[in-house]
């Protein structure tokens, strides 16, 4: 039997209202959020793109709930191939770097920062859609302030 979270992601569309509904549902329960993140990070799963669509909205509102998954995110980011999942993934990377730059934000380890830098630079070099490149450039700009 499919879980409620799975069914909501499966029924979601690319429309903002649909993605907001799924992200709000995930933020209400840590188990739902965990399931959404597991689906998003499983790049071979059919719903991984849809899960990323809503995950970027979760990270925009409540990034600290995503903090325990940063290590896995740094591993999965370079492996994402689908353009539809890449835009929200690079947007999440931007949120992480922006938060890392703040005093009371999420602290990234130096290794995590370097993994993000490497993955984001690869995205700029590769033939990707513009939206993911924009978020990659924004994130690299924020990280560049630290590494001059």
Question: Which stretches of residues belong to each language-model region?
Answer:
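Alpha-helical scaffold domains
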Residues: 1-148
